[in-house]
């Protein structure tokens, strides 16, 4: 059934940079499939705005991490969410699309759904990794879920939640065979010799917690592997400034800090030491051996430990369904342990070949033309709504 030619209005919310990237790809797909007059508004970042999105609030107002760290931002977040709900109910867009940020978006999605506005959520929360009733909240809030990973629709189906597997956009963007030599040329690194990429995170709290440990591990690795070089991307000038005291404290390190270009830095590497997060999936798609680590404040760690039931936190291990790369978390993330594990990943050629096979299979599974599939799913929801009207 064709969509109406009168003006469509879609409200969207992305709460952090990764969501901005996903939403921008979705917007690109929607703009190819919906009338040119369609309007897109809500809360988004610069990538969404570049796609013609009208952001009514600054996205960074919603960007938080951790249970304890978020407390100071709660009043402002609740105020924005209340204003957004009132706007949705007054303007009644054709659909509301929440992109990730489930703690913020589920409440908005439930309000939209209760008012007869179709609610779509892009990025299924990790219902497969956490205990509790989150899937019940999804069932109350979401009309249709756009899933990045192939095992998620079966879980949602049991809860009565309609969903579409759309793949992961990183798998579309990253080539199956990374150009390590070209990446080294781009960064001015030697063509030969071992290179380790180190990614301690992008937030002040992350650098404060794990940065000193990562730098101490790098110092140990250089002692044990004298020819090794390190490359560390700094996403912003503020992050580079935050890293500078650690760099100054370790002048002996053969370290190159890049302005952004994290994917190029990882492509140039033979092994990666990385803080847990989406970047671990990127490392897997680049077919790189890695060690995954994180440290969070004690109370946050206790809450996470009690809620989680999977034995792993890194996306490569979750997708493989087993430990294919080591994880060293919290008090296990000592400089000695990180150095030992990373050098093992660097030196073990048989393991490298095995990981290349595992990660290539993972890459092919996730490569689905996400922007097109996600946009087509949204259009189907809009068509179904028109059919019921």
UniProtKB/Swiss-Prot annotation:
Disulfide bonds: none annotated. Coiled coil: none annotated. Its EC number is 2.4.1.182. InterPro entries: Glyco_trans_19 (IPR003835). One of its GO terms (molecular function) is lipid-A-disaccharide synthase activity. Pathway: Bacterial outer membrane biogenesis; LPS lipid A biosynthesis. This is Lipid-A-disaccharide synthase.
């Amino acid at each position: 059934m064709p969509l109406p030619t009168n003006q469509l209005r879609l409200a969207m919310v992305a709460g952090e940079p990764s969501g901005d990237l996903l939403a921008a790809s979705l917007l690109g797909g929607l703009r190819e499939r919906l009338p040119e007059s369609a309007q897109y508004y809500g809360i988004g970042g610069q990538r969404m705005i570049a796609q013609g999105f009208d952001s009514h609030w600054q996205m960074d107002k919603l960007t938080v991490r951790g249970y304890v760290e978020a407390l100071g931002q709660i009043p402002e977040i609740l105020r924005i969410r209340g204003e957004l709900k009132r706007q949705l109910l007054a303007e009644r867009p054709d659909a509301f699309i929440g992109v990730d940020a489930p703690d913020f978006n589920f409440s908005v999605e439930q309000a939209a759904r209760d008012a007869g506005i179709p609610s779509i959520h892009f990025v299924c929360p990790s219902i497969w990794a956490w205990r509790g009733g989150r899937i019940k909240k999804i069932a109350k809030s979401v009309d249709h879920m756009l899933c990045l990973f192939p095992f998620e629709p079966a879980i949602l189906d049991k809860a009565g939640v309609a969903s579409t597997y759309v793949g992961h956009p990183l798998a579309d963007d990253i080539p199956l065979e990374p150009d390590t030599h070209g990446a080294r040329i781009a960064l001015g690194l030697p063509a030969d010799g071992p290179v380790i990429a180190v990614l301690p995170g992008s937030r002040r709290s992350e650098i404060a917690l794990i940065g000193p440990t990562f730098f101490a591990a790098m110092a140990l690795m250089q002692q044990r592997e004298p020819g090794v070089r390190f490359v560390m991307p700094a996403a912003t000038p503020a992050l580079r400034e935050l890293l500078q005291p650690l760099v100054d404290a370790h002048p002996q390190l053969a370290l190159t800090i890049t302005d952004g270009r994290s994917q190029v830095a990882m492509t140039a590497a033979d092994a990666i030491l990385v803080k847990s997060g989406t970047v671990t999936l990127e490392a897997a798609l680049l077919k790189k051996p890695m060690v995954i680590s994180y440290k969070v404040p004690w109370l946050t760690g206790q809450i996470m430990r009690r809620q989680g039931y999977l034995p792993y936190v890194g996306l490569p291990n979750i997708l493989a369904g087993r430990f294919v790369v080591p994880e060293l978390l919290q008090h296990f993330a000592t400089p000695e342990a990180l150095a030992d594990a990373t050098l093992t990943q660097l030196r073990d050629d048989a393991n490298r070949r095995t990981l290349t096979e595992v990660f290539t299979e993972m890459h092919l599974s996730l490569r689905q033309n996400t922007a097109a599939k996600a946009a087509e799913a949204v259009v189907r929801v809009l068509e179904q709504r028109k059919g019921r009207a």
